[in-house]
């Protein structure tokens, strides 16, 4: 049972906003019958370029969510943003059968993405982006594919070093 549920919590100490991507009820079959528990997938971010995802499992949904948030805090990555509103360059990535294409966009475009990809960009702080999910639409695989794409992205400094140029030349030519 996949439920895309939006709940935005901001914690005072770290200022992370968190969104629930999916809640699943899973069953373990034992001799006496079935034992039900819950699996929760959460994405958290500071809306300034840091984002993380985590899965939590427990008998209660609230406890599973707490575990997922703690796992997401341990799994945070930094994404370099252009003008604090969009991605620096286009990127493609794949995880299992899910493929994602993430493209930077002009000012005023908004977040053109569906499902769990939109939630990730909301907590990341991106305002203008175009994203496409191809293949499997399983929320877990799509989230992991987006994170694989983020890990493939290069900062302007890395691009400048690869091209043996100055950072200013890279940023001006956009």
Swiss-Prot record:
Superkingdom to which the source organism belongs: Bacteria
Domain (S5 DRBM): residue spans on this chain: 16-79
Signal sequence segment: none
Xref: Gene3D superfamilies: 3.30.160.20, 3.30.230.10
InterPro entries, alphabetized: Ribosomal_Su5_D2-typ_SF (IPR020568), Ribosomal_uS5 (IPR000851), Ribosomal_uS5_bac-type (IPR005712), Ribosomal_uS5_C (IPR005324), Ribosomal_uS5_N (IPR013810), Ribsml_uS5_D2-typ_fold_subgr (IPR014721)
Function description: With S4 and S12 plays an important role in translational accuracy. Located at the back of the 30S subunit body where it stabilizes the conformation of the head with respect to the body.
Entry remark concerning the domains of this protein: The N-terminal domain interacts with the head of the 30S subunit; the C-terminal domain interacts with the body and contacts protein S4. The interaction surface between S4 and S5 is involved in control of translational fidelity.
Family, as annotated: Belongs to the universal ribosomal protein uS5 family.
Name of the protein described by the UniProt record: Small ribosomal subunit protein uS5
Organism of provenance: Ehrlichia canis (strain Jake)
Name of the encoding gene: rpsE
């Amino acid at each position: 049972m996949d439920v895309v549920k939006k709940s935005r919590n901001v914690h005072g100490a770290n200022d992370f906003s968190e969104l629930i991507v999916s809640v699943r009820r899973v069953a373990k079959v034992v001799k006496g019958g079935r034992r039900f528990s819950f699996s929760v997938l959460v994405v958290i971010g500071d809306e300034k370029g840091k984002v993380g995802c985590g899965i939590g499992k427990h008998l209660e949904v609230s406890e599973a969510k707490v575990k997922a948030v703690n796992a997401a805090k341990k799994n945070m990555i930094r994404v370099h943003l252009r003008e604090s509103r969009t991605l620096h360059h286009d990127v493609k990535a794949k995880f299992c059968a899910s493929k994602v294409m993430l493209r930077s966009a002009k000012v005023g475009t908004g977040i053109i993405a569906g499902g769990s990809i939109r939630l990730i960009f909301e907590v990341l702080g991106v305002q203008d982006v175009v994203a496409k999910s191809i293949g499997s639409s399983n929320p877990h695989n799509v989230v992991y594919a987006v994170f694989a794409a983020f890990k493939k992205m290069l900062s302007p400094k890395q691009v400048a070093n690869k091209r043996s140029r100055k950072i200013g030349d890279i940023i001006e030519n956009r």
